[in-house]
């Protein structure tokens, strides 16, 4: 059976990230790269559970502050911990110009992104990290699983996300010392 991330109905993760940023801006919700990563991950997980297929193509990895989509991370990493005002771009193969990646039009995707923003969009980056680190959740199973030797940088496959996503429903508390200036960095 092929991996779920190869589903032809999944969408360019940059397009979904741009949609999330556009909808967040319309709701006056500022989003940092760290928050974007977590919200995109939560939307992807909900989509896997609710629709039985992945929301975005590619994969998430277990990084220090939770799940990260490396392609989306690279698009917005120049922002550091600041709020994102730009959009993901791509190179048009016909013109050679760099253009903004168009958000998807699929109504299910729009509704899924809106639901995540309305339920989690105003949470701090630290709170989103705490939820993504839930015991028994996908990130925890990969990053802290037996034999992983601190599995940071390991892929979190869609099967693990779908099977373990129910553990993401936890009460949110911010560990002492975590502020909203957290910045993710690739595992070394």
From Swiss-Prot:
Deletion consequences: Essential, it cannot be deleted unless the downstream gene for cognate toxin socB is also deleted. In depletion experiments the half-life of SocB is 19 minutes in the absence of SocA and about 2 minutes in its presence.
Entry's induction text: Induced by DNA damaging agent mitomycin C, part of the socA-socB operon.
Entry keywords, A to Z: Toxin-antitoxin system
Keyword Protease found: no
InterPro entries: SocA_Panacea
Domain of life: Bacteria
Known role: Antitoxin component of an atypical type II toxin-antitoxin (TA) system. Unlike most type II TA systems, neutralizes the toxic activity of cognate toxin SocB by acting as an adapter to promote its degradation by ClpXP; degradation is dependent on the N-terminus of ClpX.
Known partners and oligomeric status: Interacts with cognate toxin SocB and with ClpX.
Protein name as catalogued: Antitoxin SocA
Lineage, broadest ranks: Bacteria, Pseudomonadati, Pseudomonadota, Alphaproteobacteria, Caulobacterales
């Amino acid at each position: 059976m092929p991996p779920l991330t190869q589903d032809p109905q999944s969408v360019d993760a940059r397009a979904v990230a741009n949609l999330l940023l556009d909808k967040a801006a319309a709701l006056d919700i500022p989003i940092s790269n760290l928050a974007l990563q977590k919200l995109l991950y939560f939307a992807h997980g909900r989509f896997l559970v609710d629709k039985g297929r992945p929301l975005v193509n590619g994969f998430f990895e277990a990084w220090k502050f939770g799940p990260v989509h490396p392609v989306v991370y690279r698009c917005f990493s120049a922002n550091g911990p600041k709020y994102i005002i730009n959009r993901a771009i791509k190179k048009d193969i016909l013109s050679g110009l760099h253009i903004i990646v168009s958000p998807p039009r699929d109504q299910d995707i729009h509704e899924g992104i809106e639901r995540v923003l309305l339920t989690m969009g105003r949470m701090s980056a630290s709170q989103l990290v705490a939820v993504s680190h839930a015991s028994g959740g996908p990130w925890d199973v990969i990053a802290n699983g037996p034999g992983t030797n601190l599995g940071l940088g390991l892929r979190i496959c869609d099967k693990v996300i779908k099977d373990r996503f129910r553990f993401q429903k936890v009460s949110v508390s911010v560990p002492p010392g975590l502020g909203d200036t957290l910045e993710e960095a690739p595992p070394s």
